[in-house]
Amino acid sequence: MQENLRFASSGDDVKIWDASSMTLVDKFNPHTAPHAISSVCWSSNNNFLVTASSSGDKIVVSSCKCKPVPLLELGEGQKQTCVSLNSTSMYLVSGGLNNTVNIWDLKSKRVHRSLKDHKDEVTCVTYNWNDCYIASGSLSGEIILHSVTTNLSSTPFGHGSNQSIRHLKYSLFKKSLLGSVSDNGIVTLWDVNSQSPYHNFDSTHKAPASGICFSPVNELLFVTVGLDKRIILYDTSSKKLVKTLVADAPLTAVDFMPDGATLAIGSSRGKIYQYDLRMLKSPIKTISAHKTSVQCIAFQYSTVLSKSGLNKGCSNKPTAVNKRTANVSAGGGGAQNPGVVREAATTSIATVPPQPTAAAVGKGAVAPQDKAGLPRSINTDTLSKEAESGKNQDFSNFDDSGKSSLGDMFSPVRDDAVVSKGGDESIGKGDGLDFLPQLNSVFPPRKNPVVSSTSVLHSSPLNVFMGSPGKEENENHDLTAESKKMYLGKQESKDSFKQFAKLISGAETGNLNASPSSNQTRSPEKFEKPEKEIEAQLINEPPGNGSSTPNPKIASSVTAGVAGSLSEKIVDTIGNSRPNAPLSSVQIRFIQNMIQETLDDFREACHRDIVNLQVEMIKQFHMQLNEMHSLLERYSVNEGLVAEIERLREENKRLRAHF
C-alpha cells in the first residue's frame, strides 16, 4: 500500500481519510449545509479536490495541500451535481439538474462548451482514457458520447426510460469498454465504438445498482454495488459473476484503491467498509463516516507507476499517475476507431530496429529506453505476468572464460559483446521478443573489421556442450583437450604478435640494421613462427559480432590452410626483397593488408557457421518446448483431483442453497 495515500468521501460533508489506517485526516463543507455533497474527484497531482452538491448550488475547487481551502467556485446557480476532471486537470466536465453537460476551462474559469443533448437530469459524467470523449448518463436511461475534438455528440443509446443510469465508468484496460449501472439493477458493459451492449448482466442486483468500478491492475475484474446490500465481482472475459457478498446495509458508493487489492464501499447508513479482495468474507475495517448516506468515494491517484501503467504503456504525467490514463502510451491521443471490443489490451510497441550494443541479452529482458524515455519494445510475456513476479533482469559479469549461460550463448538477439583490456564485465539489456524475423539485422556482416590489441569477450561452446547431458564422454574428453591446446596457443600467440609488431615498427623507423646473413636466417623464423600462432589466435578469436565462437575442431581444419597460405605469401614477399635492406612501407602495408583480408574472410566464414548453428539450436529448442508442452498437458491433469474438486463444488452449492 502506498504511503500516505488518502481518499475522500462525501455525504453531509467532505471527509479526507488515511487509506492505510482509515483515520480521519480532515473534514470540510464548501457547500450549503442542508444538502448532501453528491460528487467528488481529485486532481491528477492530488493537491486539489472538486466537489458538487445534490442541490446544484455550485462547483467548488478546494486546495488540499495542507488544510482544505476553497479556491475557486464555478457554475453558481447552474444546478451542476456531478463532476469529473480530465487527466491534465485543466478541464472539468459537469452535469446536473438542467439536463446540460458543461465543459469548464479551469484556467479561464469559464464554460468552454455546453452540450444540451439530454432530455432529463444528468446523473453521471466521465472522460475516456485519452480525454477525447465524454460519456454522460441521465435519468431517462440515455447514454451519450460527446467528442471533445469534433464537438459532435453520438446518438443516445441505452435500455430505455425505465432504466435510469446511476453511474458510468470506463475500463482502464479495454479502451472502448464502458460500464453502466441502472435503477432496475442491470449491469451493462457497452462497446462505445458500436454503441451496442458488449454484455448485459441481468438481474444481478435485486434493487437499484448505485456504483461500478474497474480494477486498476486486473483487466478482467470489475465490481458493482447496489441498494440490495450486494457487492458483486465480475469477470469481463468469461462474462460471469465471480463472487457475491452481502453487507449489512444498502450500498451507495465504491472505489478501488490504486493497488487493486482493496475496496472502499460506502453505505446508506453513513458507514465505509474496507474490503481486502484476498479475504472477502468480511470487511477488514468499518468506520462511521457520515451522518447521512455516503454519496461518493474517491481515492487519490498513485504517485508511483502502478502495475497497470507498466503493463499498458507509460503515462504522460511526470508527477502523478492517473488511474484512468496510466495505460495511455506516450504518443497517445486521437479519436476512437470503429471496431469490436478488444479482448487483449493494447501494448505500446514501437517499431524501432534494434541497435547494436556492447551487451549480452537474456530472454525475458525488458526493452531499454532511448534518450526520450520511450521504450523500444515491450516483452508481452513479461507484461502479462508482471502482477505475479517482476521480470526485470540484469545480465552482467560475463568474463572471457566462456562462463555464459545456455540462453546467452545461443540467443539470437545477442549483440556485439566486446570490452577493452581494463573492462571486467559487460552489462546491458535488449529486446527479448520477435527475434526470428530480425536475424539479418541482429547479425550484420562485418565489412570493416579492425584488428587491435584489445581483448575480446568470448564464450566458448565448450562450456555448453560439457554441461549437456546428451553428449558422450569421449566427445567431452576430446573437447577438453582441444580447449587446453587453444589456451596454450593463445598465450604463445600474444608473445609472437608482440614480436611481430615490434619488427614492423622497427622497420618503419629504419631501425632494422642487421647483417645480411643474420637477416636472412632470422626473417624466416620470425614469419614462420606466427604461422602456428596465427592459427591458434584465430581459433580463440570470436566472430565479428561477438555472439559465439566456432567449434574448435571445425576452426582448426579451416584455419590450417588459411594460415599456411598466408605464411607462404609473407615469406615470399620478404625473400624477394634485398637481403640487407629494411622493409619498405609498401611491403609493410602489403603484409598488413594480407593479414587483414585473411582474418576478414575467416571471420565471415565463422560468422556464417555460427548463425547456422544458432538457427538450428533455436529450432531444436522450439521442438523441445512443444514436446514439453504436450507432455505437461498430458500428465498434469489428475483425474482423482478433478473428481474431488467437482464433488466439493457440488457440496458448496448445496451448502449455499441451505445456509
From Swiss-Prot:
The WD repeat units are at 1-31, 32-71, 75-114, 117-156, 160-200, 204-244, 246-285, 289-332
Instruction: State the UniProt keywords alphabetically.
Output: Cell cycle, Cell division, Cytoplasm, Cytoskeleton, Mitosis, Phosphoprotein, Repeat, WD repeat
Q: Which residues carry this modification: Phosphothreonine?
A: T382, T549
Q: Which GO terms describe its molecular function?
A: gamma-tubulin binding
Record GO biological process: cell division; microtubule nucleation; mitotic cell cycle
Ranges for the region named Disordered are 383-433, 508-531
Which residues lie in Basic and acidic residues bias regions?
Answer: 413-432
State a GO cellular component annotated for this protein.
centrosome
Modified sites of kind Phosphoserine = S411, S426, S468, S515, S636
Biased segments, Polar residues type: 508-522
How does the record describe the protein's post-translational processing?
A: During mitosis, prior phosphorylation on Thr-549 by CDK1 promotes subsequent phosphorylation by PLK1 on Thr-382, Ser-426 and Ser-636. Phosphorylated NEDD1 can interact with gamma-tubulin for targeting the gamma-tubulin ring complex (gTuRC) to the centrosome, an important step for spindle formation.
- Entry-linked InterPro entries: NEDD1_Spindle_Assembly, WD40/YVTN_repeat-like_dom_sf, WD40_repeat_CS, WD40_repeat_dom_sf, WD40_rpt
Name its cellular compartments.
Cytoplasm, Cytoskeleton, Microtubule organizing center, Centrosome
Record's PANTHER family?
A: PROTEIN NEDD1
Q: How does it assemble?
A: Interacts with FAM29A. Interacts with HSPA1A and HSPA1B. Interacts with gamma-tubulin in a HSPA1A/B-dependent manner.
What this protein is reported to do is described as: Required for mitosis progression. Promotes the nucleation of microtubules from the spindle.
Query: What protein is this chain from?
Result: Protein NEDD1
